[in-house]
Regions:
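Small-residue-enriched alpha-helical segments and adjacent helix-cap loops
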Residues: 2-3, 22-137
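Intrinsically disordered, low-complexity polar/charged tails and linkers
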Residues: 1-18, 38
């Protein structure tokens, strides 16, 4: 039995983590939402460059596993075309926002999450690795 390696950080799209089956590429949907084009695009990218499966994390992110080093650049290009990448890995790591699944049209959840994302993108914060924000206006 092999020892478990604790990395001390979470993977992202721009900072993938090596695992036993290849790279783990984590996608953090903006404001906790995907449109239909993004959802289909992620499925196609997972089938082409990963193991074909998409994992849903406990914090509402998606991850594609089994990505090869050779396929990673094309996967990143595809995620960029879908509007799912941040400017850099530091911004990506800070944008860890969990949005209630019980939001309703017209409530403040989406505007609050969008404003928090904008504020985080321009900030240089020294947050703990697994620090996150949760938004529930109900």
């Amino acid at each position: 039995m092999s020892a478990v390696a604790i990395k001390g950080w979470c993977p992202g799209a721009l900072r993938p983590m090596q695992s036993g089956d290849g790279l783990v590429v984590r996608i953090r949907p903006r404001v906790g939402r995907l449109d239909a084009i993004q959802a289909v695009g992620i499925a196609e990218l997972a089938a082409r460059y990963g193991n074909g499966l998409i994992d849903l994390t406990s914090r509402g992110n998606l991850q594609i596993r089994g990505v090869s080093d050779a396929g990673y650049p094309a996967l990143i290009d595809g995620l960029a075309e879908l509007g799912l990448l941040d400017a850099d890995s530091e911004t990506e790591a800070q944008r860890n926002i969990l949005v209630t699944p019980f939001w309703t049209a017209g409530d403040d959840t989406r505007p609050l999450a969008a404003e928090l994302e904008r504020a985080l993108a321009g900030a240089s914060l020294d947050l703990p690795t697994k620090f996150g924000f949760a938004i529930d206006d109900g």
